[in-house]
Amino acid sequence: MNVLKKRWAAAAAAAAGLVLLTACGSGGSSGSSGGAVTLGFAQVGAESGWRTANTKSIQESAKAAGIELKFSDAQQKQENQISAIRSYIQQKVKVIAFSPVVESGWDTVLKEAKNANIPVILTDRAIDSPDKSLYKTFLGSDFVAEGKKAGQWLTKEFGSATGQVNIVELQGTTGSAPANDRKKGFAEVIAADPKYKIIASQTGEFTRAKGKEVMEAFLKSQPKIDVLYAHNDDMALGAIEAIEAAGKVPGKDIKIVSVDAVKDGMQALADGKINHIVECNPLLGPQLMDLVKKVAAGEQVPARIETQETEFDQASAKAALPSRQY
């Protein structure tokens, strides 16, 4: 009996370890019920307001489309996403979609999905793999273009400056597609004029708390900061707290340009604490569900689908805020 009790306890612990795998909809152990398309979605985490809006869009759109959604939160850990994807393969879902924590290290698990004849859709973030057959399509933003837009705003804003323009950069999650590409696009633009210099650059992990912490360190180590470039609004909002605590005025003493355009960021822009925001649209749910149905039916889809996005200054932020969904 003691041996049996130990086995039951081990089984219960293993089940608890999979608590991140949460079925939404009718659920169940089979890949689908009543012929419904089943989607296994491995979300990167809940690190920001953008990500929360993205998750909500996916969950609501799946319900509206009649798609059975099995959803997991990887808590920003690649190993959790890989475990979730393997679980979806075992459950024989019709389609797998995920937003990769980082760009590399996916080939093995995606080959497992391919061998199981389960199509994969990349959402929001791309992967770095020479084998493009491992996924059907990518749905999301052009992160390099977002970085370029931020750089173009900066060069226009400081075009008449005669001295060196000192820039600090809050990067996203190390190794992630948006962090790599937003940095690349921004750097390409400012490289055209040597007066623009990034004097400090560090990851803020896309979170408000880390953005504040890193900005505090920048302020202590750098006597003159002209501009903050934040890879997302949440880090910019954390940085604003640090700037104000240091007795400086965000948006004036230190100009701020960020990416996302979530509601809190837009409010800071309307209040003059952020100077410019490049939009990254999180509401991918409707487009994703359309793609899920198509690939489940064996239809051909484009290899890359980019979302339409804009930019905001203070006036346009004030106009957009009343109807902002996220």
Language-model segments: which ranges?
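A residue-level marker of the well-folded mature domains of exported/periplasmic proteins
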Residues: 2-7, 24-326
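C-terminal motif of bacterial Sec signal peptides marking the signal peptidase cleavage site
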Residues: 19-23
